[in-house]
């Protein structure tokens, strides 16, 4: 689509007028920047002379431009009438029939048909269709019949398990249309046995798959597949018993093909059956007979418990599954949760020394596997025991900070807010909800009352008695979690006066209940509201003994006040990855993509290389016909004339005028190692930019692209002057953890209401004019709020772009951003590492967090959720001006994490289903809680409005609601302790301190898990690596598998070990300390001592253990 086509499309679309203007502004801004970048590059100051990323508006546009086929219009029509799945097949058939490639042979048409079909299914976002499929070719069976073979490469992983398996379905459909025979497995060799051996080698030597599958399933799949599943080798491990097979070109493991087999065809077999029915394919009925994915013999609950046991040193366990005192499940969504982001009360972070922060990844047991942290202060806060024995319910963050230093035990962590949409996405079973304020309000409405929450216990009791509604949750304790014997203990207080006192033996029961109380001289003392509630519930009319009835029912009968269960389930939570907000850098960090070979030292220093006489580089052979100087750019750096690429025949060595040698027919080689005037070019670049190079100016060792195309040195100089580094594709990037946001307040993002009105935010969610900092506003589809650190980095990047436009391209500056405020309103692109499409976004503010806030639809357009991953943010002008495919590797996977396409608009109906499953209601209806009480699957609940129900209407763009409010996004610190603490010992100390502090965590069990899942495997792995280590040159960095006889590098310098005794033993002293201090069992203790003995056998007796700082 052109800019005019986009405007026409927007005029005809069903959307609110403000969104029409919004989208028009985004697309207009994108095309305007594209034109400016194209104008700048037309002066030929770099190696491409043109803007390389293509603008693709929708799915059809992306697929067409990814494959350079004129299919956008037909595909758009097919999508409108047939849907994505059937459109993929129908378009594949048309391509195979030659409608769009009339001059191509049958193999080329089949290849394109399969790739384009997969591109449609994967929404034209991932690189899987281009590089995940290595080849689609025809081969011959033993009987001479032709069949279809699909060769899979590593990048197929980016498509996802189901979509990667759908590749085989599309290939089978195309095979039938082409009239090819079925693949006959094992007709020449034992191909099923090869796959079984290969898959087990991969699991043992390379890594695990998402699922574990049975040998019999592998045998069934390979023997029944109508299309051959082949692949390119991805890892250096070879099969032993199935080498030299006639139809398999490699003896090494084929990771891409194995993943399609394991995680796709077998692991997603049930999902594939639905696709097969939709496609109308026969011959795949055998999929129904597979056992499918198994969790190594465990049921779902065991698998979740196993995830909780996989504890990493320094990453705390906050709550163990189904432990009273752990995080109680609370259903609902805040404006900053959902889409796999879960809500915690911010006081939890404060009292746990900021073990968690916004964006910290947590591993959970329901409804999915991972999530990120968000803070919501309208859910239940923790209940704690202080050093003096008092039990206190924390009121708010300030109260938590005040109490932090005197907390002895966290008795109850409070609530964890989880979206219904997360349960729906995982099709998880709902669990009954505890009695919470939302249900109480519905009970009040059912009773015909509209009163707000009670302000005191007296009022709560009165409401319950007069209206017959259950006691308000604020005055409800965990009665459902105590025994009849414990209840009997509470019926006999020492004093029933204004303050109720109990003997010391009752204190554990009161703590279990979560009742705030004072520590008196004889035992716990209840005062105020707590004393009033106890008198009303159990003391004035004591419940009689009845072991057959639950405790809440006994109390309800005797008191006349209905008591509901406060506890539902507690969720297992452990820390995963810390939040991330940092510049994206190459390793080592690089200023300029210019090769120095081995002359630049460990930092690839261009200045060091330039000082060497006769410097040469393996670089594109581009030379000026006028002055004869070698050049990087199309226009000569010395005289300004247009340069030409010199090609040489690889076979006969003659100069080649075109792409191929006329004599040999071989392609001409465009690069060679030539003497290069690096020093003169650096001097010229410094004069041109007015920037002086500082030591070290970092280049790269070698260039990745087959033509060895380098960047102009001017870019590296300007980047260095602004403390920026370059990524492998020529762009400057900042990475930040993904986090969802649907609404915000101006005060949260540091942007004034006046500035927001300029950006189109005229009103708040209530339709009132936006004037104040605390009005709630709905976030637009492609507006983002970025980390403050990222904003500062991008301001520097703006200065770099402007200097580059001025000094290198001779164009006027574009950004002219003097400070952070000037960045507001500018366009960027978001890019996930496994994709090749940058999604446009507009910056509207900053937060002191380490996350990038955006709508679920925007994150979904990048094929991401908020489970802890980080994506890149790139200035749109940077992506258009500086990105080049010619900097990227030609190897398989080289095009991943590159903005080949720019998507200016995010259309909700094109988002992934996960974004469509988000609830958009002000409250969850009674029917939902009834379904939860019945433990129904989330997919069986139809009474909750989700985004999916609004698709193809104006309501899909906005008017979303949420169930729980919050007054702020963050806490007093923007980063988690894991990110800020220095040593692993400090992190472990915090982990142990948290385990001892939280009642829902068993410290000894955590230590045992740390030893078994982290320390022991790490020590064993390091010991194994020591035996296999390489040796490295201290000067040039060259690596040797074995030490040469001369015991020196080829450059003459010495060699050193890459793994030392210290690195093998780094956790041994720590492990010894842990097994001695904690009751981890004889087995764990024996393992550590056995490892210690083994290390001494390898290295000899040490000179004594190195003391730890914590030993003093």
Swiss-Prot record:
Protein name, per record: DNA polymerase II large subunit
InterPro entries registered for this protein in UniProt: PolC_DP2, PolC_DP2_cat_dom, PolC_DP2_central_dom, PolC_DP2_N
GO molecular function terms listed in the Swiss-Prot or TrEMBL record: DNA binding; DNA-directed DNA polymerase activity; single-stranded DNA 3'-5' DNA exonuclease activity
Function: Possesses two activities: a DNA synthesis (polymerase) and an exonucleolytic activity that degrades single-stranded DNA in the 3'- to 5'-direction. Has a template-primer preference which is characteristic of a replicative DNA polymerase.
UniProt record, GO biological process: DNA catabolic process; DNA-templated DNA replication
Reactions accelerated catalytically: DNA(n) + a 2'-deoxyribonucleoside 5'-triphosphate = DNA(n+1) + diphosphate; Exonucleolytic cleavage in the 3'- to 5'-direction to yield nucleoside 5'-phosphates
This enzyme's EC code(s): 2.7.7.7, 3.1.11.1
Pfam families linked: PolC_DP2_cat, PolC_DP2_central, PolC_DP2_N
Superkingdom of origin: Archaea
Source organism of this protein record: Cenarchaeum symbiosum (strain A)
Sorted UniProt keywords: DNA replication, DNA-binding, DNA-directed DNA polymerase, Exonuclease, Hydrolase, Multifunctional enzyme, Nuclease, Nucleotidyltransferase, Transferase
Subunit note: Heterodimer of a large subunit and a small subunit.
Family: Belongs to the archaeal DNA polymerase II family.
């Amino acid at each position: 689509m052109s800019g005019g086509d986009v405007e026409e499309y927007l005029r005809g679309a069903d959307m609110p007028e403000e969104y029409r203007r919004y989208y028009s502004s985004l697309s207009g801004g994108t095309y305007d920047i594209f034109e400016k970048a194209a104008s700048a590059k037309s002066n030929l100051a770099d190696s491409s002379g043109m803007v390389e990323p293509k603008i693709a508006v929708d799915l059809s546009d992306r697929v067409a431009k990814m494959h350079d086929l004129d299919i956008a219009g037909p595909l758009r029509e097919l999508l409108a009438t047939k849907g994505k799945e059937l459109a993929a097949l129908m378009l594949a058939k048309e391509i195979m029939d030659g409608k769009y490639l009339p001059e191509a042979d049958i193999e080329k048409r089949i290849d394109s048909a399969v790739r384009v079909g997969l591109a449609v299914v994967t929404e034209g976002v991932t690189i899987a269709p281009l590089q995940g499929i290595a080849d689609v070719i025809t081969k011959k069976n033993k009987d001479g019949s032709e069949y279809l073979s699909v060769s899979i490469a590593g990048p197929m992983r980016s498509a996802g398990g189901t979509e990667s398996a759908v590749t085989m379905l599309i290939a089978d459909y195309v095979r039938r249309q082409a009239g090819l025979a079925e693949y006959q497995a094992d007709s020449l060799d034992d191909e099923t046995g090869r796959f079984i051996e290969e898959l087990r080698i991969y699991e043992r030597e390379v890594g695990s798959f998402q699922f574990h599958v049975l040998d019999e399933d592998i045998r069934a799949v390979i023997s029944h597949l109508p299309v051959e599943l082949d692949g390119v080798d991805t890892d250096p491990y070879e099969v032993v018993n199935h080498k030299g097979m006639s139809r398999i070109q490699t003896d090494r493991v084929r990771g891409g093909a194995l993943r399609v087999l394991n995680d796709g065809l077998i692991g997603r077999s049930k999902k594939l059956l639905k696709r097969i029915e939709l496609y109308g394919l026969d011959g795949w009925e055998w999929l129904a007979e597979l056992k499918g994915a198994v969790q190594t013999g465990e049921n779902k609950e065991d698998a979740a418990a196993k995830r909780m046991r996989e504890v990493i040193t320094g990453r705390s366990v906050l709550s163990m599954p189904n432990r009273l005192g752990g995080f109680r499940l609370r259903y609902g969504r805040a404006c900053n949760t959902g889409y796999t982001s879960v809500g915690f009360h911010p006081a939890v972070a404060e009292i746990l020394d900021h073990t968690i922060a916004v964006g910290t990844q947590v591993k959970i047991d329901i409804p999915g596997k991972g999530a990120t942290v968000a803070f919501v202060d309208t859910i239940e806060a923790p209940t704690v025991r202080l050093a003096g024995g008092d039990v206190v319910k924390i009121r708010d963050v300030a109260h938590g900070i005040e109490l932090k230093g005197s907390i002895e035990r966290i008795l109850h962590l409070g609530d964890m807010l989880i979206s219904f949409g997360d349960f729906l996405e995982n099709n998880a079973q709902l669990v009954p909800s505890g009695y919470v304020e939302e249900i109480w309000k519905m009970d009040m409405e059912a009773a015909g009352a509209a009163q707000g929450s009670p302000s005191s216990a007296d009022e709560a009791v009165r409401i319950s008695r007069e209206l017959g509604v259950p006691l308000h949750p604020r005055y409800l304790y965990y009665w459902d979690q105590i025994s009849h014997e414990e209840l009997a203990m509470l019926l006999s207080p020492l004093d029933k006066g204004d303050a109720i006192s109990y003997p010391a033996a009752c204190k554990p029961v009161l703590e279990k209940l979560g009742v705030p109380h004072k520590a008196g001289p004889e035992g716990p003392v209840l005062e105020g509201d707590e004393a009033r509630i106890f008198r009303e519930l159990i003391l004035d009319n004591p419940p009689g003994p009845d072991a057959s009835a639950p405790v809440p029912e006994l109390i309800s009968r005797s008191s006349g006040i209905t008591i509901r269960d406060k506890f539902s389930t507690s969720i297992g939570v452990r820390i995963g990855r810390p939040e991330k907000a940092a510049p994206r850098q190459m390793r080592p960090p690089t200023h300029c993509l210019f090769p120095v070979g081995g002359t630049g030292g460990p930092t690839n220093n261009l200045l060091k290389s330039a000082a060497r006489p006769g410097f040469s580089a393996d670089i594109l052979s581009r030379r000026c016909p006028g002055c004869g100087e070698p050049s990087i750019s199309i226009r000569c750096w010395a005289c300004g004339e247009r340069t030409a690429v010199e090609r040489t025949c690889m076979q006969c060595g003659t100069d080649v005028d075109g792409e191929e040698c006329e004599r040999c027919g071989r392609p001409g080689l465009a690069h060679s190692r030539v003497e290069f005037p690096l020093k003169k070019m650096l001097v010229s670049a410094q004069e041109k930019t007015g920037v002086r190079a500082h030591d070290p100016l970092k280049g790269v060792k070698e260039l990745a692209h087959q033509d060895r195309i380098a960047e102009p040195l001017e870019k590296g100089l300007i980047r260095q002057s602004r403390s920026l580094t370059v990524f492998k594709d020529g762009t400057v990037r900042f990475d930040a953890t993904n986090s969802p946001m649907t609404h915000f307040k101006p005060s949260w993002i540091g942007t004034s209401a006046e500035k927001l009105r300029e950006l189109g935010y005229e009103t708040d969610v209530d339709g009132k004019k936006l004037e104040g900092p605390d009005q709630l506003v709905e976030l637009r589809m492609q507006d983002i709020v970025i980390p403050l650190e990222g904003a500062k980095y991008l301001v520097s990047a703006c200065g770099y772009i402007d200097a580059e436009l001025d000094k290198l391209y001779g164009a006027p500056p574009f950004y002219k951003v003097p400070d952070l405020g000037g960045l507001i309103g500018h366009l960027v692109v978001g890019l996930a590492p496994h994709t090749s499409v940058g999604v446009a976004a507009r910056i509207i503010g900053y937060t002191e967090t380490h996350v990038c806030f955006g709508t679920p639809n925007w994150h979904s357009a990048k094929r991401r959720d908020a489970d802890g991953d980080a994506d890149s943010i790139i200035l749109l002008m940077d992506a258009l001006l500086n990105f080049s495919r010619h900097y990227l590797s030609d190897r398989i996977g080289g095009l991943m994490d590159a903005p080949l396409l720019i998507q200016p608009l995010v259309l909700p109906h094109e988002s992934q289903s996960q974004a469509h499953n988000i609830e958009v209601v002000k409250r969850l209806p009674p029917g939902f809680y009834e379904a939860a009480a019945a433990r129904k699957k989330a997919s069986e609940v139809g009474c909750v409005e989700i985004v999916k129900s609004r698709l193809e209407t104006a309501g899909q763009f906005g008017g979303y609601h949420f169930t729980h409010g919050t007054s702020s996004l963050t806490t007093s610190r923007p980063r988690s302790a894991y990110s800020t603490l220095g040593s692993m010992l400090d992190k472990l100390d915090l982990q142990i301190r948290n385990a001892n502090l939280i009642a829902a965590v068993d410290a000894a069990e955590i230590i045992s898990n740390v030893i078994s899942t982290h320390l022991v495997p790490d020590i064993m792995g390091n010991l194994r690596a020591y035996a296999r280590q390489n040796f490295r040159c201290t000067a040039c960095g060259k690596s040797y598998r074995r030490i040469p006889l001369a015991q020196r590098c080829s450059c003459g310098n010495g060699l050193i070990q890459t793994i030392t005794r210290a690195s093998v033993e780094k956790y041994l002293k720590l492990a010894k300390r842990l097994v001695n201090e904690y009751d981890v069992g004889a087995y764990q203790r024996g393992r550590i001592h056995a490892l210690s003995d083994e290390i001494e056998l390898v290295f000899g007796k040490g000179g004594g253990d190195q003391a730890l700082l914590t030993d003093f």
